[in-house]
Amino acid sequence: MSPFDRRSGGSGGPGGWWILFEPELHLGTDILVPDLAGWRRERMPLLADEPYSELAPDWVCEVVSPTTARIDRVHKMPIYAREHVSYLWLVHPGLRTLEVYRLEGQQWVVVSSHGGAEGVRAEPFEAIEFDMSRWWLEEA
């Protein structure tokens, strides 16, 4: 069981999250597909039967590449802010970095930046330390 799956009152991590890979989000008139998205279970107690969600997630993670960087930053970030997504991670495999953003009002604020093979505790998952060295492909 993942620490994100732990039910309330259990042990082993923060629990209380649904984390989905490439969920389809219908946010107003916009349809977005982040690389990862997470909802706190108190906001979404059950996963919907529909193949999409109209409920904005609490956290999104975009894996940035040269072909998606502009879309992620210029198009998606303002929509996530408009829809009150609380946290946004931008993972840059080419740079081996993680940028962590928190929404304050309608503005994204950089909370922290990490790189390389660090052990990371990043909002909103500070209870877990992520080993960033496991995120990157081995160099040839």
Specify the residue positions occupied by each region the protein language model found.
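Gly/Pro/Ser/Thr-rich low-complexity, intrinsically disordered segments predominantly at protein N-termini
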Residues: 1-140
